[in-house]
A protein has these predicted regions:
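N-terminal secretory signal peptides that target proteins for export/translocation
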Residues: 1-3
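Bacterial N-terminal signal peptides
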Residues: 6-18
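Flexible loop/hinge segments at secondary-structure junctions
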Residues: 22-344
Length: 344
């Protein structure tokens, strides 16, 4: 954990270094996207000399900052509605997809050994299931020795797109969770311990015996955390990996959804991972500085065209080229400078 935390902060510092210029982009928001955004930014700076200062502050913070025009772009794992985009003069588009996974700290339990269902996960986070050897969990894991240990549920303390994806899934599979708690970036969890960012949730789970949390998959893998299998929409137990994320993403109807606002949780398909989602970049339609907006779009275009292999290394799914064509057409139509001229 210490090594990964240090690498995150070192990358953040490196991304922020450089002389201020029109080519130094600023962004803020999603911690879900941070591992791949950092990787892309380092490679892009090596290729072009242009830098990115990205703050991993959570999707809610990213939305606030782009609305306040304090950054060149925000990033959120919860898409804004068409009405909200229109109201605030914003445009959004997906940049990457990935998976959210339940992670646990249980002695002797290895990655992928524990099986959970959506309704059991919902009951844990509603505080209804309190012990790891509870009958509801034991029935799903007859070959696994579960301790008589109290469950500590860990959640996000900040406004979070990862929370939105997790709570969206739980709301779809548990009517009680949907009624009492619902899907949101700022979930009012009835119990448990909060952590700031995916980093904070991962750290809390690692330090608390008996803890369960939810993080983007790259954080689980980098920190060697024990993640669970989940029973998906088709009743199949699946492991989180690039193939199961791709299976869930395959049904995304980007071309038919206003504002590209696709939510891919609980997708049908025998191989689909049930908590899959996208990160969306959000920008002002009318840019105060057209040069900076153009540089952001150049960075994203480069990432779409050159970043797929880097994304796959971290188990993210690149946006298909057919969808990129649609996205870049939106750039031309909607992103303008202060004189009303197309930036792209």
């Amino acid at each position: 954990m210490k090594l990964f935390a240090q690498s995150v902060f070192c990358i953040a510092a490196m991304l922020a270094i450089g002389t201020a210029s029109a080519a130094e982009m600023t962004g803020a928001g999603s911690s879900f996207v941070y591992p791949i955004a950092a990787k892309w930014a380092v490679a892009y700076k090596e290729a072009t000399g242009n830098s990115l200062n990205y703050q991993s502050i959570g999707s809610g913070g990213g939305i606030k900052q782009i609305k306040a025009k304090t950054v060149d772009f925000g990033a959120s794992d919860m898409p804004l509605s068409a009405d909200e985009l229109a109201k605030d003069g914003l445009v959004q588009f997906p940049v990457i997809m990935g998976g959210v996974v339940p992670v646990v700290h249980l002695d002797g339990v290895k990655p992928g050994e524990l099986k959970l269902t959506g309704d059991v996960l919902a009951d844990i986070y509603m505080g209804k299931i309190k012990q790891w050897n509870a009958p509801e969990i034991a029935a799903l894991n007859p070959g696994l020795k579960l301790p008589a240990k109290e469950i500590t549920s860990v959640h996000r303390s900040d406004a979070s797109g990862t929370s939105f994806l997790f709570s969206s899934y739980l709301s779809k599979v548990s009517p009680e969770f949907d009624k009492k708690i619902g899907a949101s970036t700022a979930v009012k969890w009835p119990d448990g311990l909060g952590g700031k960012g995916n980093e904070g949730v991962a750290a809390n789970v690692q330090h608390i015996d008996g803890a369960i949390g939810f993080v983007e998959f790259a954080y689980a893998k980098k920190n060697g955390m024990a993640y669970a299998q989940l029973r998906n929409h088709d009743g199949q137990y699946v492991l989180p990996n690039l193939d199961t994320f791709k299976a869930a993403a395959a049904g995304a109807a980007w071309d038919k959804t206003p504002g590209f606002a696709v939510v891919s949780t609980d997708q049908p398909g025998k191989a689909s991972w049930p908590i899959t989602g996208a990160t969306f970049v959000i920008m002002q339609k009318s840019a105060t500085d057209g040069g900076r907006s153009k540089e952001v779009l150049k960075f994203l275009d480069w990432s779409y065209k050159n970043g797929a292999a880097m994304a796959a290394e971290l188990d993210y799914i690149a946006i298909p080229s057919t969808v990129v064509t649609l996205i870049e057409a939106e750039w031309k139509a909607q992103v303008k400078d202060s004189a009303g001229k197309a930036v792209w």
